[in-house]
């Protein structure tokens, strides 16, 4: 793919837009970001806070520890952290620097200031409205569709900033066009890209995500899935790939304060796309250039799949990210495009039934299962086995299958998502 090709430029922009740092699970961090921005607009410490959120936000914040808060969980903790210690200009690193004094102040604020939560659906799966009041003054901030998309800022009845929200397809047009993504072009781009355009992004992903994976194995986080895998199944590369990715999630879901480079708005997906490839590259002595090109494949394949599914869904994002990792591992192992697309199809056929029931400790095990499915899918191809079109949700070709997965995750699982939310808030 030539550098002056519009697809080339779009793919570079997509990677720049997606591979950004975030500290902590991104949904509570988005709440903290909105709260910090509202506090900035209000200009004083609010004496009451009202939070209106979609069900998928409730699902993804309820059970996860908010970093830099001293192991506090939930929406109230995320909002209080943003108000007391947030720096809105840092976006998804909004609460990356919190002193012990501020941690104590967050706890005091939670005990003394009313924070009310309302479950509301306004036509957007990802939707946050934070209203902060002090006396007769108020400030309101809305984030919708994706984690950093502040679409409305209001103070005392005056709209200070507003971006029209139509639907997710139109909203995406503000960023690089994801509809240009397809498997063949992703592969061609990865093979021909001038790495100077993306090397800094990918090196940061390697550094950040490997660091939190290492921390997950050293510390005591959640259910310690990474350590369980290494203890039980040994130290071969396929198990290390699963264990280290799981360990990164162990740490991230359970209060670790290290940042992660995300994919599709998710730290867990960013870890899943990268850490297994880092382990395979070490084992194979692949060199930086080959690892970079493999990471281009894994990241863009995951984004391609997730574009159809949507930002938040009852379809587990680790599944799509794991399939992307499988395609990247194929490249590292020296196989070609046909091996990659069969690996992706096989992986999606195996684990597309995993549901998302929010961010919490078991995400690490789902990541391990998804990476395992990708490795099995690749081994199936090497043994001349495959799931063929007509086998369940497997369609006639890779693009039709990915499109079908998007329909399943976005449309078919709406009711599933609603029932999961009802179960979680009973």
Regions found by a protein language model. Give the residues of each.
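Signature of multi-pass transmembrane helix bundles
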Residues: 110-255, 420-426
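Early transmembrane hairpin of solute transport permeases
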Residues: 29-132
């Amino acid at each position: 793919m030539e550098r002056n090709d519009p697809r080339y430029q779009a793919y570079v922009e997509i990677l720049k837009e997606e591979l950004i740092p975030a500290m902590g699970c991104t949904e509570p961090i988005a709440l903290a970001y909105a709260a910090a921005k509202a506090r900035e607009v209000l200009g004083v410490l609010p004496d009451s806070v009202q939070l209106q959120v979609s069900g998928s936000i409730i699902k993804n914040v309820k059970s996860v520890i908010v970093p830099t808060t001293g192991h506090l969980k939930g929406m109230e903790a995320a909002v209080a952290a943003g108000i007391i210690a947030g720096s809105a200009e840092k976006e998804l690193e909004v609460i990356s620097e919190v002193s012990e004094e501020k941690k104590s102040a967050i706890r005091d604020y939670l005990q003394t200031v009313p924070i009310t939560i309302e479950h509301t659906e306004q036509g957007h799966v990802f939707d946050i409205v934070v209203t902060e009041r002090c006396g007769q003054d108020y400030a309101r901030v809305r984030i919708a569709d994706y984690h950093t998309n502040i679409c409305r800022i209001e103070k005392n009845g005056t709209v200070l900033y507003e971006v029209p929200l139509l639907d997710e397809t139109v909203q995406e047009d503000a960023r690089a066009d994801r509809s240009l993504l397809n498997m063949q072009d992703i592969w061609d781009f990865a093979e021909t890209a001038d790495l100077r355009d993306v090397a800094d992004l990918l090196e940061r992903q390697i550094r950040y995500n490997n660091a939190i994976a290492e921390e997950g194995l050293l510390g005591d986080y959640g259910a310690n899935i990474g350590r369980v895998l290494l203890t039980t199944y040994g130290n071969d590369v396929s198990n290390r790939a699963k264990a280290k990715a799981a360990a990164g999630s162990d740490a991230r879901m359970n209060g670790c304060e290290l940042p992660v480079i995300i994919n599709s708005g998710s730290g867990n997906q960013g870890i899943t796309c990268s850490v297994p490839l880092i382990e395979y590259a070490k084992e194979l002595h692949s060199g930086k250039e080959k690892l970079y090109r493999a990471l281009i494949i894994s990241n863009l394949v995951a984004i391609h799949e997730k574009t159809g599914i949507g930002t938040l869904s009852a379809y587990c994002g680790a599944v799509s990210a794991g399939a992307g990792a499988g395609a990247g591992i194929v490249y590292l192992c020296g196989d070609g495009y046909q091996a990659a697309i069969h690996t992706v199809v096989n992986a999606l056929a195996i684990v597309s039934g995993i549901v998302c029931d929010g961010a919490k400790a078991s995400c690490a095990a789902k990541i391990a299962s998804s990476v395992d499915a990708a490795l099995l899918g690749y081994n199936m191809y090497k043994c001349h086995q495959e799931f063929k079109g007509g086998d369940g949700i497997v369609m006639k070709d890779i693009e039709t299958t990915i499109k079908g997965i998007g329909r399943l995750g976005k449309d078919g699982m709406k009711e599933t998502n609603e029932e999961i939310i009802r179960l979680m808030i009973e």
